[in-house]
């Protein structure tokens, strides 16, 4: 976790509940192609069970400082549904578009007061691109001393190895290390 410099928050903390991988290919090509991978009507994908973080570290005040987990999967190389243009956008804004979802107004949400829209498909990410969901509770004290708690699920599409927002590839025989920095309910930073 890292407090954004423009916020007067204190005690920023994350209590991880678990993680899971979504859209793991159940098959892979025996030999690599120059572009793309096994895809089409006969291809299947699965979602792993939610697992606890393998490591978590806390400071002297018992505030979350880091955590981690490891997984292995077949390659999954996808072309974006829609390319992200870098014109006039910072790297952080380009990255945020990778996780952008379409929002559907499907009517009345009497069971969810205040909700007007339902999340739809990803706007830029391809339908079968692999992503990791990390869930937990994010909390902090705001600048008025009020404690803010939120049950959160952060989505991180794999790829982005060279900072390219249109890269959704996970290549075979490649080790990726993702460093995810939580900076708030709607704010994460990623290094690959």
Regions found by a protein language model. Give the residues of each.
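Tryptophan-paired
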Residues: 3-172
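Acidic, serine/threonine- and proline-rich intrinsically disordered appendage/tail regions
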Residues: 161-192
């Amino acid at each position: 976790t890292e407090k954004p410099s423009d916020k007067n928050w204190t005690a920023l903390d994350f209590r991880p509940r678990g993680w899971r991988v979504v859209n793991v290919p159940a098959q892979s090509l025996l030999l690599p192609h120059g572009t793309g991978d096994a895809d089409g009507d006969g291809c299947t994908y699965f979602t792993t069970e939610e697992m606890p973080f393998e490591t978590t570290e806390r400071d002297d005040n018992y505030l979350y400082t880091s955590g981690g987990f490891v997984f292995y999967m077949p390659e999954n190389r996808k072309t974006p549904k829609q390319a992200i243009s870098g014109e006039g956008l910072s790297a952080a804004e380009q990255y945020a578009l990778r996780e952008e979802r379409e929002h559907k107004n499907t009517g009345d949400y009497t069971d969810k007061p205040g909700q007007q829209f339902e999340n739809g498909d990803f706007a830029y990410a391809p339908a079968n691109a692999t992503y990791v969901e990390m869930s937990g509770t994010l909390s902090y004290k705001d600048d008025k001393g009020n404690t803010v708690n939120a049950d959160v699920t952060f989505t991180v599409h794999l790829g982005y190895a060279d900072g390219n927002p249109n890269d959704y590839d996970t290549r075979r025989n490649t080790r990726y290390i993702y460093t995810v920095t939580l900076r708030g309910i709607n704010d994460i930073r990623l290094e690959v």
